[in-house]
Swiss-Prot record:
EC number(s) reported in the record: 1.1.99.1, 1.2.1.8
Its membrane topology: Peripheral membrane protein
Binding positions for FAD per the UniProt entry: 4-33
Subcellular localization, as worded in the UniProt entry: Cell membrane
Gene Ontology cellular component terms for the protein in this record: plasma membrane
A Pfam family per the record: GMC_oxred_C
PROSITE patterns assigned to the protein according to its UniProt record, in alphabetical order: GMC_OXRED_1, GMC_OXRED_2
Alphabetized GO MF terms: betaine-aldehyde dehydrogenase (NAD+) activity; choline dehydrogenase activity; flavin adenine dinucleotide binding
Record pathway: Amine and polyamine biosynthesis; betaine biosynthesis via choline pathway; betaine aldehyde from choline (cytochrome c reductase route): step 1/1
Protein name (record): Oxygen-dependent choline dehydrogenase
Listed transmembrane segments: none
Length: 549
């Protein structure tokens, strides 16, 4: 088995790479994927988003090591084990990120990845329905749209933000991210529109693209060059040969794991694991970043939430409506309004994100109270805490060791306390007078810094946005793993292209920037001239230095 390009992973970036690298028909591509089919209602029905993440069939099911600042809880760290990777099990929320995120990337050594450089790739990949004209793509493979927005609670949330003095944005993925607005989702015609739907399936219709179901054990490196991938399938170990390059797109947990198993990483750690050191790159597995969030839940005094649909019978009705007619509650992920806010005067870009949900519920679908309710998922998105990923052993099938080191920076506590108090201010606005009942969580007795900190230690969870473990940077940066053209430093014929190469976490959900990374990396791999830089200037709040709104 051989191809010009061998891609490890069919997720957000890997699928985009397969599509673009094979586009002109001159290059052969093999995609290696361990996970199975993404066909079925648990994945394809947007409202069923909680199901695939809870199923071992679709999820690698990783857990962090005990987190010392979170009562030593082991935090769930899901990654997609299915065609389409995590884009097939995620919440389908589409957020490009803020312009300052990508300008920061360039400042950190990722030359050519500033906002002006990446905006054309966002436009190339998007098929936006109703986005801001001139700022959005309209004929790309990735369908992006808003939900039906039929529930009055969505509108109450946006109106409450206006009453509190915050900005409103008509398109947070356009020129102006900051403010309250309607949330976008990667759905189309009532179905999840994953990277597999947008990129991989069209690519697999080409004669020069092949998908191989297998377990990738390590990258084969000969005389300083990646020549293939050692795989296991059907109980046999084989090698898939790469005539040109191997591209690792296996997630922020498995991409560094594969590099280390192949002898690329911190020399001392590799020796400890009994692995021959091919290239000493101390940054492999370091710089792990993530977003955290908690659920702020409130009783609704009016029977307008989704609570009535939680009994099994009504879930079955919603499922049948979706299955046979592609209509009803099943066609949306139910995250249909949102906010992107700045935490304080002097903060230039939004750093607090809200997902609003018209029901008070846990992620597994259980009601938080025996009543109608509503909630926000809220978190501080620019944490300075950093973790790492390392090997548990030299066994390729052993789970990686994941240490997030959540809440290890003092500023995180200050910002999350502010999130609690700010949410109370928003839910206290006149727009919620018709609906506001008792506070379910954190609870009205949780008021002091100490009480809020206690709540956070027990209830903060991952937003499932890990990144940064194969950092992109300048070649002379000792902690960089790949250069700005996504080439692994010190090895020929090997690249990494997924969220693991982000030098710094972006503001918002990571599916969109991960796909963009695949799109842009494809041009680097093919030696093409990058798309022309944009000269569009995004909106920055003129009051940012003196006001938080």
């Amino acid at each position: 088995m051989q191809a010009d390009f061998v891609i490890i992973g069919s997720g957000s970036a890997g699928s985009a790479l397969a599509y673009r690298l094979s586009e002109d028909g001159r290059n052969s591509v093999i995609v290696l994927e361990f996970g199975g089919s993404d066909v079925g209602p648990f994945i394809q029905m947007p409202a069923a988003l909680a199901w695939p993440m809870s199923m071992n069939r679709y999820n690698w099911g990783y857990l962090s090591e005990p987190e010392p600042n979170l009562n030593n809880r082991r935090i769930t760290a899901p990654r997609g084990k299915v065609i389409g990777g995590s884009s097939s099990i995620n919440g389908m929320v589409y957020v490009r990120g803020h312009s300052e995120d990508f300008n920061r990337w360039e400042e950190l050594g990722a030359q050519g990845w500033a906002y002006a450089d990446v905006l054309p790739y966002y436009k190339r990949m998007e098929h936006s329905h109703g986005g801001e004209e001139g700022w959005r793509g309209t004929d790309g493979p990735l369908h992006v749209q808003r939900g039906p927005v039929k529930n009055p609670l969505f509108h109450a949330f946006i109106e409450a933000g206006k009453e509190a003095g915050f900005e409103v944005t008509e398109d947070y993925n356009g020129s102006k991210q900051e403010g309250f607005g309607l949330m976008e989702q990667t759905t189309w015609r009532g179905r999840r529109w994953s990277a597999a739907s947008a990129y991989l399936r069209p690519a697999l219709k080409r004669p020069n693209v092949e998908l191989i179901r297998c377990f990738a054990r390590k990258i084969v490196i000969e005389n300083g060059r990646a020549t293939g991938v050692e795989i296991e399938r059907g109980g046999r170990i084989e090698v898939v040969k790469a005539n040109r390059e191997v591209i690792v797109s296996a997630s922020s947990f498995n991409s560094p794991k594969l590099l280390m198993l192949s002898g690329i990483g911190p020399a001392a750690h590799l020796k400890e694991m009994g692995i021959d050191v091919k290239v000493d790159r101390p940054g492999v597995g370091q710089n792990l970043q993530d977003h955290m969030e908690f659920y702020f839940q409130q009783v609704s005094t009016k029977p307008v939430s989704l609570y009535s649909w939680l009994p099994w019978f009504w879930q079955g009705v919603a499922g049948a409506q979706w299955l046979f007619f592609k209509r009803g509650l099943g066609i949306s992920n139910q995250f249909e309004s949102c906010a992107f806010l700045r935490s304080a005067p002097g903060v230039k870009q939004p750093d607090i994100q809200y997902h609003f949900l018209p029901v008070a519920i846990s992620y597994d679908g259980k009601a938080a109270a025996k009543s109608h309710g509503f909630q926000v998922h809220v978190g501080y998105n620019l944490s300075k805490s950093r973790g790492n990923v390392s090997l548990r052993s030299s066994d390729p099938k052993a789970d990686p060791v994941i240490r997030f080191n959540y809440m290890s920076h003092p500023e995180d506590w200050e910002k999350f306390r502010h999130c609690v108090r700010l949410t109370r201010e928003i839910f206290g606005q006149k727009a919620f007078d018709l609906y506001r009942g008792p506070e379910i969580q954190p609870g009205e007795k949780v008021q002091t810094d100490e009480e809020i900190d206690g709540f956070l230690r027990e209830h903060l969870e991952s937003a499932y946005h890990p990144c940064g473990t194969c950092k992109m940077g300048a070649k002379d940066d000792p902690m960089a793993v790949v250069d700005p053209e996504t080439r692994v430093i010190g090895v020929d014929g090997l690249r990494v292209a997924d969220s693991s190469i982000f030098p710094h976490i972006t503001y918002g959900n990571l599916n969109a920037p991960s796909i963009m990374t695949g799109e842009k990396s494809a041009d680097h791999i093919l030696g093409r001239q990058p798309l022309a830089r944009s000269n569009q200037e995004p909106w920055i709040n003129p009051r940012w230095a003196v006001s938080d709104r």
